[in-house]
Amino acid sequence: MPQKRALVTGASRGIGKTIAVALAKAGYDVAIAARTVSKDDPTPEHSVTIHRQDSRALPGSLEETAALVEAEGRRSLPLRMDLTDLPSVETALATVIDRWGGVDVLINNGRHIGPGLMDTILDTPIDEYMKFLQAHAVSAIRIVQLVLPAMLERGGGTIVTISSGAGYDWYPANPPGHGGAGLGYRLGKSAGHTIVGSILVEHGHQGIRAFNVDPGFVLTERNSLDLEATGFDASAAAPPAAVGAAVAWLVDSPEADDLQHSNISAQALVLERGLYPDWRKP
């Protein structure tokens, strides 16, 4: 039986890390991409607003994720990748194709964090908007362009975009900084959200499956850092591993095919199907 191979971007921590581990448990070798390769060489995070400087490094690295993948008896392939830097994206994909001949599953999970995520239209510098579009749209499209030909040659593959309600709800419930996201983040997510539809209409008849997955509110390392000073009640947040369980099910289950043309709530899917028994929403 041919070995199953997956690529997960943004896999040094949070949702991407748990997706990588869940896919390894499901029998996939997993290429993992992010900026932070080693815990000994941490990459500082950017502040989500121009009004606060915060460059603390978050826990997590590709090195640690790779160890978890390999603990499941699967191969890992750590790749340094910065989604705001297209050459680094292309270099990482060239490595995957050279080493593994491509992948059967792509999880476009990586995202850009920076000023504009929680800033108003007027406060956000125009170059910050460009970074969101580069990371969430241009780089995501380029990754699809680079993995899709081999999938088509093999007669099938699965592509998942980790989306957000910020990407498909055109009228936000709250302004940025008061429970809502800034236009920079919303632009990036909405642009990335449209990729799946184009994949399906152009290549669905050729065996390519594609899904948009909204993780909902998840208590990642990044969110924990942002919330620690606010006193916000995060008790209803899902653990990242719940999203990992949802994605692993979508990738391998034929029953998931009917969900391809919808906005999939990872949390609702997990609860409905009992995919992560350790979590029950309060």
Short names for language-model regions:
Residues P2-W100, G114-T120, T124, E128, ...:
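Short-chain dehydrogenase/reductase
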Residues K4, R74-R75, G102-V103, M151-G165, ...:
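Active-site loop of short-chain dehydrogenase/reductase
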Residues A26, R99-W100, I113-G116, L146-T158, ...:
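A short helix-coil junction within the Rossmann-fold of NAD(P)-dependent oxidoreductases
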Residues H112-G114, D123-D127, T158-H205, F217:
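Catalytic loop of short-chain dehydrogenase/reductase
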Residues V144-Q145, G197:
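A short, exposed helix-loop element centered on a Lys and neighboring polar residues
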Residues S190, N212, A229-P282:
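C-terminal helical subdomain
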